[in-house]
Amino acid sequence: MSQKNYRPWTPEQDYLIPPRPRDWLPEGHLAYFILDVVAQLDLRRIEAVIQAKDPRGTVPYHPRMMVALLLYAYATGTYSSRRIARATFDDVAVRFIAGDTHPHFDTIAAFRQVHLDALGALFVQAVQMCQAAGLVKLGHLSLDGTKILANASKHAAMSYERMKADEVRIQNEIQALLERAKQADDVEDAQLGPGQDVVDVPAELQRRESRLAKIQEAKRALEGDAHRHRAAELREMANTHDETAADERLPARQRKTARTLARTQREKADELDPPDGPPTAGGSADAGLPAHQTPALADGSPTAKSQRNFTDPDSRIMVAHGEYVQAYNAQVLVDGDSQVIVEAVVSNQAPDVEYLVPVVQRAMERGLKATTMTADTGYMSTKNLDWCQNNGIDAYISMARQRHSEVPAAVVTRRDPLAVAESSSEPERPPPTSRERMVAKLATPEGRKIYARRKTIAEPVFGQIKEARRFRRFSLRGLWKVASEWSLVCAVHNLLKLFSSKQKNIALSVAG
């Protein structure tokens, strides 16, 4: 029986004619799309920073190549600068994008760090590209949030109560070690004479001093945050008393008391947070977004349970899937027809309720206003309902956690004629509240149908980002940096939606 022949295999065979780089990738590959997109992006902010440097020295890599490299890496779930650098050797598509150059991982990390703000700003351009392609319909937007792990361990966080206890304990340990060192010195002086072979400060003493310095620094920062939070509360209370003092309908004694209280509260606030004090680091990446406020007592000191993380002080311990994690709260506003993210923010405030107004408002400022919007119960508040109504948004916000197929419980509104027996003597009932109107709207078949769509709009986006592309933890630390990184991640998500749409259109044209 004749032996089976094999196809030729000569992996070390040189090419007589060098192959074209595009011959290595199939037609319609994502790498081609990324290069086409980068050619259209406005990168003047990045180029301006590079051109401002001294022309002497190492020649930099082309900024469009570096941006394309990062976009493709993020699109394929590669976020580590070391892995991206290795991929320029191991991955054919990455090698093609890099033009067979191999930036060091330090170069990739530095480029991302220096141009992080400009890279995050690419999100707006990605949304505009999706708009131009007809992917953003703005008929139905869905708002949702998810917890993204911080680049820090929750075990690196310490409460204010623990800080104070550890500060005293370590100070006592340092004192005991110094006493032991002095005793050792006295023994050596008696044996060898003064000044001979004095013992060095033990390494354990240096470790404790270093640990003590870190705890004291974190303690001061936590106290400063609490002071500013309490000062803001006092100033808000003082403003309320000013309104009372200005109301001429009130008795003179009450107005005088209000003026005294306002003055006292402002003096206390200025003592805790001087108006001309130095600027503070941290806080929200955007002044319009909610940010975590350190709980403070009446005297401005932190509460016992107030915490601060030593590795990433801006991150907070939050609850995700029933467990406590060190994380940030990432928010997206998603188009219902294409799952394109039209607005993306991140902050360190765990509850979702305060995000609705600033996130939707930011989208509206860029001309992205929905006629219908859905959100889960985490965003339910009278303030949010009234704001949506005043801005012409038909909102569907769940009143309580429920399955998407579950029918909301019937609620009798104040004006329901079936609520009470008809009576000519019955006084006119007040109009239903915004919450009652929302319950009634969600109880209708149309309301249930619209709200059920939320499950297929925002939630799959988080699945694609966190599971398909494995972005579950930020690579960077600090609120401003993770905000830009989240914008970059969402920009890549939108570009992938645009890529998928183009591929479908090509397939349809071929089939037609």
Can you say where each PLM-predicted feature lies in the sequence?
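Anion-binding and metal-coordination hotspots
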Residues: 2, 8, 70, 78-90, ...
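Short, solvent-exposed coil/turn linker segments
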Residues: 20, 42-45, 159
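Basic, short loop/linker segments at the boundary and entry of helix-turn-helix/winged-helix-like folds
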Residues: 27-71, 76
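Hydrophobic alpha-helical membrane-insertion signals
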Residues: 2-32
